[in-house]
């Protein structure tokens, strides 16, 4: 994967939980205006890799760079400097009690605050836009402890968008969402990339990756099986190797997008 125009890069990363390596020698780059999807079976290292790019999991070996700055060690960016440029939506976040949706979304502006100063005009506009994009404006004054899982997912995403970073990292952003909001969130992600944001997103749904990704990184057992554009990576051979099940890949007759279907013993067979 080319490092041209790369905003965030991982080089030869070895990531471990305790003594066990869960990512072994992986390199990747997130480029401006590009959606890079990380796909693969459970336990393949996707979320750990994303957390390392977000400076939440220090590599045993290798390095992460944001532009020409290192993320750890000498000359590393400060926490606020990093947070002004990179944000991460994780899969699991604690649900705060006694705070409103607006409060949680406003928290995305914390890298820009100093002392007791509140949100400035630009920050208020960013909060409004983030809530509009994720469809949570009408619930702004509701307590977040009253929300469903899907509603809460959209609120946390709005908080990330309010941060206005050049790099957006998303771990399963369509989790818990019904079909309408899955489509809307995927559209938002694509729109942000079209505006120049570098997006790295973990997805379990291969069809979602086919819809929005420019580049795909297919992982299995902590290593890269294939990387490249959708057509290069989402193939029967690569997917069957990574997932350990036969995967039929075809173009949707209506949209033309690649469609991936795993074939079990009772699955209808393609003609």
What are these regions (language model features)?
Residues 39-41:
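The feature captures the beta-strand-to-loop junction immediately N-terminal to the Walker
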Residues 54:
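Helix-to-loop junction immediately C-terminal to a conserved catalytic motif
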Residues 63-81:
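ABC ATPase NBD Q-loop/coupling interface
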Residues 106, 121-139, 164:
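Conserved ABC ATPase "signature" region
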Residues 118, 143-147, 151:
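Conserved ABC ATPase signature
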Residues 168-172:
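Catalytic Walker B motif of ABC-type/P-loop ATPase nucleotide-binding domains
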Residues 242-271:
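ABC ATPase nucleotide-binding domains
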């Amino acid at each position: 994967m080319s490092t041209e125009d790369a905003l965030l890069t991982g080089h030869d990363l070895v990531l471990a939980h305790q003594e066990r390596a869960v990512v072994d020698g992986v390199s990747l780059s997130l480029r401006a205006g590009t959606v890079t999807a990380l796909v693969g079976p459970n336990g393949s290292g996707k979320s750990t890799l994303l957390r390392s790019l977000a400076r939440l999991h220090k590599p045993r070996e290798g390095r992460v760079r944001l532009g020409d700055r290192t993320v750890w060690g000498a000359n590393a960016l400060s926490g606020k400097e990093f947070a002004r440029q990179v944000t991460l939506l994780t899969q699991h976040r604690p649900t705060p009690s006694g705070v409103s949706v607006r409060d949680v979304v406003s928290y995305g502006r914390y890298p820009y605050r100093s002392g007791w100063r509140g949100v400035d005009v630009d920050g208020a506009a960013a909060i409004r836009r983030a809530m509009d994009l994720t469809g949570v404006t009408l619930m702004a004054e509701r307590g977040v402890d009253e929300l469903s899982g899907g509603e809460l997912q959209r609120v946390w995403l709005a908080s990330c968008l309010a941060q206005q970073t050049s790099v957006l990292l998303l771990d399963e952003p369509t989790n818990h969402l019904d079909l309408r909001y899955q489509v809307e969130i995927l559209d938002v992600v694509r729109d942000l990339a079209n505006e120049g944001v570098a997006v790295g997103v973990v997805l379990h749904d291969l069809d979602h990756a086919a819809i929005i990704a420019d580049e795909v990184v297919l992982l299995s057992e902590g290593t890269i099986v294939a990387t490249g554009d959708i057509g290069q990576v989402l193939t029967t051979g690569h997917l069957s190797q990574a997932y350990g099940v036969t995967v039929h890949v075809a173009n949707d007759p209506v949209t033309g997008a690649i469609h991936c279907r795993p074939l079990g013993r009772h699955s209808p067979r393609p003609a």
